[in-house]
Amino acid sequence: METVQSIITEWTDPKSWEKLVQHSFKDSNWKELIDPVNYKFNFGVTPFSQFQIIPIVLVIYLVTIFSIKFLMKNRKPFSLKFISILHNAILCIWSLIMCVGVLYEIIKRVSNEGPLFTVCEDPNGGFDKGVTYYWSYIFYISKFYELLDTVIIVLKKKPLIFLHVYHHCKTVWWKKYITMIQILQFVCLGIAGVLHVYTINTIGCFTHYPAFAAAYSINFSFLFLFSKFFVKSYTPKNSNSNTNIKSKKID
């Protein structure tokens, strides 16, 4: 409850917004981006840690996207082939590094602390420091970089759909299986969530319920959206149109 109240106070206090405007990036501890062992999350010191950063970035993002879209209205699309390849390569390498880092740390801590480490939190705190939470923070930072996806799409004059990560041509055969894997991922996360709730209620360990509720609300929203996309794109009613598109491309 104290955390919720502090967030509300932070958002409604005009002085906090004034401090954010005056805040210089040189005041941030940028070493935290490359120091997982000594990582500790500190509001106002850890880069991009202010509550107001999110709405400000989103406003800039939306203004930028729709401005570019307006300017590109009567222009030819940019190819951006090399930039797209480089951007996707960076995302792949970044994701691989995060995956390896998280798996290594989880395996090490489960070996030392037992499997309940993955479910129960330390009631005395500690969720804001350490290697495990460093990778959570790096994942958060990656979301800012991923906003470039939409910029590239708009510059290439590709259609902007809600799930714009799937903006590529629907006739590419492997896209269907990627979507299926994504849906399976969200189903597995949902099952893990049920097991999580069962475990914490059975043994009575501490967990942060607001964070848990927020995380799984997002998970189920993605499950709904990806399932809707799959049904719309790959159900039999669209098979004829997809076949026609493929045949036209072959011709």
From Swiss-Prot:
Top-rank EC class of the record's enzyme: transferase
Membrane-spanning ranges: 51-71, 82-102, 135-155, 177-197, 211-231
GO MF annotations, alphabetized: fatty acid elongase activity
Keyword Manganese annotated: no
Compartment(s): Membrane
Enzyme Commission number: 2.3.1.199
Keyword Lipid biosynthesis carried by entry: yes
PROSITE patterns named in the record: ELO
Role description: Could be implicated in synthesis of very long chain fatty acids.
Record-given protein name: Putative fatty acid elongase DDB_G0274669
